[in-house]
């Protein structure tokens, strides 16, 4: 009887531990789902901003083939201002970091789910590493931007962000494009350096878009997997 009592107590303790672990895994999963949802929103914004950067790089290259005076100088100055775009993607990593640092990965018994979580973290690290390089090149571009555009124009344009170009009215753009602007022909050396650097930025943003898309797909898969595994709404 004593053996049976001890055995039953052991079973009860195992069940209790299992229930506690399941509860903790479920609570962590709720936070992870929210983090991944926030990440997908941030990824969409980043992809849109990168798309605008890529497009205006093409505009600058096209304008550079013209005589950079009057309207062409104004347009070139306008787009040049937005070449300094170094806003990072704010990943939501606190929950997963807490899970790792507290040894709570053991609560997640689904190996495929764990594998996806680790794959997502590796992909985020890869994206962040490249964006660190993007920021370094962006800071190098700032010196060239300052050499090329007029400080007053720079000040007026600083009220607008890269993403706002997508919704900026034609009237507002036309005001900038028709603003009195000095010839940029005497700044061709700085312009050449700027264009070469922006082409590098453009190329890497195009390449990084693939990583962002993979991260978005994986985040959505994890949201669905976590909801299914832990019966979340």
Label every PLM stretch briefly:
Residues 14-233:
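Long, hydrophobic alpha-helical segments that serve as membrane-spanning/inserting helices
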Residues 1-19:
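Membrane-embedded hydrophobic alpha-helical segments
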């Amino acid at each position: 009887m004593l053996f049976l009592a001890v055995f039953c107590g052991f079973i009860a303790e195992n069940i209790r531990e299992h229930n506690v672990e399941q509860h903790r895994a479920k609570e962590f999963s709720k936070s992870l789902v929210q983090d991944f949802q926030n990440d997908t929103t941030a990824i969409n914004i980043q992809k849109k901003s990168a798309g605008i950067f890529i497009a205006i790089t093409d505009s600058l290259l096209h304008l550079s083939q013209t005589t950079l005076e009057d309207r062409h100088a104004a347009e070139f100055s306008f787009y040049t201002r937005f070449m300094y775009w170094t806003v990072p993607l704010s990943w939501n990593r606190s929950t997963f970091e807490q899970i790792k640092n507290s040894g709570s990965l053991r609560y997640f018994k689904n190996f495929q789910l764990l594998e996806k979580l680790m794959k997502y973290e590796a992909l985020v690290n890869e994206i962040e590493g490249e964006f660190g390089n993007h920021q370094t090149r962006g800071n190098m571009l700032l010196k060239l931007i300052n050499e090329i555009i007029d400080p007053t124009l720079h000040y007026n344009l600083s009220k607008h962000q890269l993403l706002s170009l997508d919704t900026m009215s034609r009237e507002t753009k036309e005001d900038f494009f028709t603003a009195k602007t000095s010839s940029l022909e005497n700044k061709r050396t700085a312009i050449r350096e700027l264009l070469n650097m922006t082409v590098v930025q453009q190329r890497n943003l195009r390449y990084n878009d693939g990583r962002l898309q993979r991260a978005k797909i994986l985040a959505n898969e994890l949201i669905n997997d976590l909801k299914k595994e832990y019966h979340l709404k």
